């Protein structure tokens, strides 16, 4: 069973606010490469958020992408700059 990809309004809003180079890079990963994955384990640097295995994050360059996983549905929720520690 392949992954069904959806996009939250908050994700699309975040995406529109990015500077041009980051926008291009994230669009390439999210709208092209993610449609070809077989499972979420194929996403780069995937980490669970919390212990319920519903929300995850992964990084693309200097940005964190938040996703919600329900069965075979992956919903992109947010894309935000990585915090500098």
Tell where the protein language model's regions lie, with residue ranges.
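Generic low-complexity, intrinsically disordered sequence content enriched
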Residues: 22, 47-50, 84
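Long, charged/polar, surface-exposed segments that mediate recognition or autoinhibition
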Residues: 19
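A short, surface-exposed loop/turn module that caps and links secondary-structure elements
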Residues: 32-57
